[in-house]
C-alpha cells in the first residue's frame, strides 16, 4: 500500500467532521465509497487507463484539508474579473470546494432553474439528490471517484427543468485559495430535464502560489431532446495538480458539446466517460492543450454507444514546448445492437521541441456491423518547408513559428459556438504562444 494509507487514516479520523458538515444525501454513499477506495487503491502505471500519469506522485504529498469548513477569506471580485467582451453571463463562484453564496448575482435565470450549492440543495431535496448523485460516477470502478465521493462536502448543482431554455450562459469561476498547501475535493452535478437547453462555462484559476491538489467529479444528465454546451478552461499555476473525472449520460435526440481547454497548469489528468443511451443522441467532444516547461496534461476519453443511430465527433490537439508531456487515450465503444453508429476520433499533436513528449492511443472497439467509424492520430513538428517559405518572405523565425502554431490550434478553437468566447480564446491563445502567460497571474479573460 502506497499513498492510499494516509487517506484511509484521514477518513477514520475525519469521518465525524465529514458527516457533521454535510447533508445526509451526500453522507449516504460516503462509507461505501471509502470501502471501494480501500479495496481499489490508487491505480499504477501498469493499469492501461493510467499508464501515462503517476497517480501516486500526485496523491503522496501531505496536503491540508478543510473538513471542518473553516472560513477562507476571499473576495472573488478582488481576485478575478472574468469578462468575455460581448458575452452576457450569469456569474457564480466556487472557492476551493464550496459554493460562494455571498456573491449570488441577481437572478436572470428562468423560473425553476437552480444554480447553487450542492450541499444546501441536498439538505432540502434529498430525494432529487438520491436519484442522481453517485449514480453514473461509480465508486466501485475508479479509485479517484471513490476518494472524491468519500471526502466531498460541497460543490455545484445546476438543474434546468423540462423545456426551459437558459438564454444567458452560466459562468462558474473555480478559485483555489489557501495560505497552506491544500487538497480540494469538489463535486459538480448537472441535470437537464427533457427539452432543456443551457450553456455552461467553467474557469479554473489559482489565487495563491501554494501547492494545490484538486479532485473534481462531475455528473451530467441530459434528458431527451435536451441540449448542453459545456466549456471547461484551466489556467492554474505550475504547482497545481488537477484530477477531473466527468461522466455524461445522454438520452434520445439529445445534443452535447464538451470542450476542454488547458492554457496553463502543473499536472492535469482529465477523464471523460460519455454514454449515448438514447437513439439519435449526438455529441461533439473537443479539446486543446498548450503546454511548455515541464507541464503534464493527460486526457482520457470513452464514448460509449449503447444504442443505435447515435453520432459522435471527437477532436483533440496539443502543442507541446519545452520539456512538457502530453497524453491522449480515446476509446470509442460500439456495443452489440448499436447499428447505424457514426463516429470519428482524431488526435493531432505538435511537438515544438525535441524534448517534448506526446503519447497517443486512439481506439475503436466495435460489436456491430452496420457502422461508420474512424480514428487516427499524428505526432510531428513544425513544417520546415513552411518555415523556410515564410522566412524567405521576410517573416522572422519566431513570428513564423507562432503563426504556424496558431493555425494548427485554431481548428479546435473555431469549433466553439459561443462567438465572444471563441474570439477571446483566439486572443488568449496568441498571448500564450508569445509566452505572455508563463504563469498564472490572474484571470486571463481580463488581460
Question: Could you tell me what each predicted segment is?
Answer:
Residues 1-146, 315, 321:
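N-terminal amphipathic, basic helical "cap/leader" segment at the start of enzyme domains
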Residues 106, 111-114, 121-395, 409, ...:
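Conserved beta-strand/loop scaffold segments within soluble protein domains that form the structured core
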Amino acid at each position: 500500500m502506497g499513498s492510499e494509507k494516509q487517506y484511509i487514516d484521514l477518513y477514520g479520523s475525519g469521518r465525524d467532521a465529514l458527516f457533521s458538515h454535510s447533508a445526509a444525501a451526500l453522507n449516504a454513499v460516503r462509507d461505501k465509497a471509502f470501502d471501494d477506495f480501500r479495496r481499489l487503491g490508487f491505480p499504477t502505471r501498469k493499469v492501461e487507463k493510467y499508464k501515462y500519469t503517476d497517480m501516486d506522485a500526485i496523491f503522496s504529498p501531505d496536503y491540508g484539508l478543510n473538513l471542518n469548513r473553516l472560513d477562507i477569506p476571499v473576495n472573488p471580485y478582488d481576485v478575478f474579473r472574468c469578462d468575455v467582451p460581448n458575452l452576457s453571463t450569469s456569474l457564480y463562484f466556487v472557492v476551493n470546494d464550496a459554493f460562494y453564496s455571498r456573491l449570488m448575482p441577481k437572478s436572470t435565470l428562468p423560473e425553476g432553474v437552480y444554480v447553487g450549492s450542492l450541499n444546501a440543495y441536498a439538505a432540502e431535496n434529498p430525494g432529487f439528490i438520491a436519484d442522481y448523485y453517485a449514480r453514473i460516477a461509480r465508486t466501485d470502478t475508479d479509485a479517484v471517484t471513490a476518494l472524491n465521493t468519500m471526502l466531498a462536502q460541497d460543490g455545484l448543482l445546476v438543474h434546468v427543468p423540462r423545456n426551459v431554455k437558459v438564454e444567458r450562459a452560466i459562468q462558474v469561476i473555480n478559485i483555489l485559495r489557501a495560505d497552506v498547501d491544500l487538497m480540494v475535493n469538489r463535486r459538480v452535478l448537472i441535470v437537464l430535464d427533457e427539452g432543456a437547453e443551457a450553456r455552461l462555462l467553467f474557469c479554473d484559476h489559482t489565487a495563491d502560489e501554494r501547492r494545490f491538489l484538486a479532485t473534481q467529479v462531475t455528473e451530467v444528465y441530459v434528458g431527451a431532446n435536451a441540449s448542453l454546451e459545456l466549456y471547461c478552461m484551466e489556467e492554474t499555476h505550475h504547482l497545481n495538480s488537477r484530477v477531473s473525472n466527468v461522466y455524461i449520460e445522454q438520452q434520445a435526440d439529445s445534443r452535447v458539446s464538451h470542450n476542454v481547454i488547458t492554457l496553463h497548469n502543473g499536472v492535469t489528468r482529465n477523464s471523460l466517460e460519455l454514454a449515448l443511451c438514447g437513439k439519435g443522441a449526438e455529441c461533439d467532444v473537443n479539446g486543446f492543450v498548450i503546454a511548455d516547461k515541464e507541464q503534464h496534461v493527460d486526457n482520457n476519453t470513452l464514448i460509449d454507444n449503447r444504442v443505435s443511430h447515435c453520432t459522435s465527433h471527437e477532436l483533440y490537439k496539443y502543442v507541446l514546448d519545452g520539456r512538457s508531456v502530453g497524453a491522449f487515450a480515446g476509446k470509442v465503444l460500439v456495443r452489440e445492437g448499436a447499428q447505424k453508429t457514426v463516429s470519428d476520433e482524431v488526435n493531432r499533436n505538435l511537438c515544438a521541441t525535441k524534448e517534448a513528449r506526446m503519447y497517443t492511443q486512439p481506439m475503436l472497439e466495435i460489436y456491430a456491423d452496420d457502422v461508420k467509424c474512424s480514428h487516427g492520430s499524428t505526432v510531428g513538428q513544425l513544417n520546415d518547408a513552411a518555415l523556410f517559405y515564410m522566412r524567405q518572405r521576410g517573416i522572422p523565425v519566431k513570428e513564423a513559428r507562432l503563426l504556424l502554431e496558431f493555425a494548427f490550434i485554431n481548428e479546435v478553437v473555431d469549433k466553439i459556438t459561443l462567438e465572444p468566447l471563441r474570439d477571446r480564446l483566439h486572443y488568449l491563445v496568441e498571448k500564450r504562444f508569445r509566452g505572455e502567460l508563463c504563469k498564472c497571474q490572474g484571470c486571463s479573460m481580463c488581460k
